[in-house]
Amino acid sequence: MTGLAIASDTLATLKVGSAFKVSHGHSKIFSPGEDHQFVVYHSGSSALNNVPIRLHVDAWFRTLTKPLTTIDAYVANYKKFCESTKAPQTKASERELLLALADDTVQICRENIDRVVGHIKDNLDNPENKKLWNEALIKEAKAAFDFYKELPRFDGFNETNTKDIITQLKVSVNSALRFYFREGYPARFASILAHAFVFRVASKVESSFDSYLTFSGFGTKEIYPASRRINLRGVIGGKLQSDPDNDVTIESEGKGLGIVYGAQFDAMYSVIQGYRKIVEHHVHNTITATMPELPEIQELANDVVKGMQTITAKDYVNPAFRRMANFSLSELAETTRDLVNLQILSAKLSGSSETVGGEIEYLTIDKVNGIRWQNRI
């Protein structure tokens, strides 16, 4: 029988002022009801346009009637819902998202400035220091402008219509500039950064405001399960800013079985591949730094990394997948639970901030039995 198993932790990290608070007991797997054989699981920001993501998805669930043919059809239906009047966000919440982006844009600029000329910020009465300060600000604004201008943009967003949306919603970077740059700043700096902000809004650069939803299960015409993950920033000017994430599957040869991760990519990669992605980057960078004058060095480094991947795939990854292919659905569910447990243990041992933890929810989906929860909070 074909099917899939899904597991998720239930920890959330909530921002309270400038601090972060860890909270347990948050379900991240959302089920639409008995008529549909799919679920949506969530990672990233807990809100979309300042609306809790659970409420947003539940509002969409209520609009679903008969089951759809494919998982892709469910994804398309959700995107269409987000831009409809049935979606719970408002013009005010669209404006709040833009204000948050403006604040973030200026804050990043401030952090970069502090690293360069932060040592003179308390002595700007000195004309030479004031000149250095202003020059550094303008240089940073130009760098931000060049960076955001070259990034890929969300569908339906260009410089002209994005600027119009920002104007219509009465948003600017001015209040953030006054807050983060109380020492003062030249008018040219503000003008360039305001222009950079237009491209920031239109661009696909990831931010802490982004949510990630993975749709997994079966449509009525699908024999085999499917999973699709989309990155969501929110609705701005009545248009949804979203981007499909196609690089979220670790698959066996022949693509008969795979692991789709909604979050914690590096950990999931290391469990399956045998080492963290950072190891590949380190090997690649070490080779290129050792012999930078060699014209073929980049090609050599790439070949070494590909060789590592091939060896581990042949000796470790594919045999593991072949064994997993013989699991029953209940055994597959236990395996997904254990994968999350491994990441919880890794997070505890790392000494870094807790980003995964709490009770684990897990379930299976197949064409005969539909959604069967193994554990649900």
Please tell me what each predicted stretch does.
Residues 1-377:
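N-terminal nucleophile
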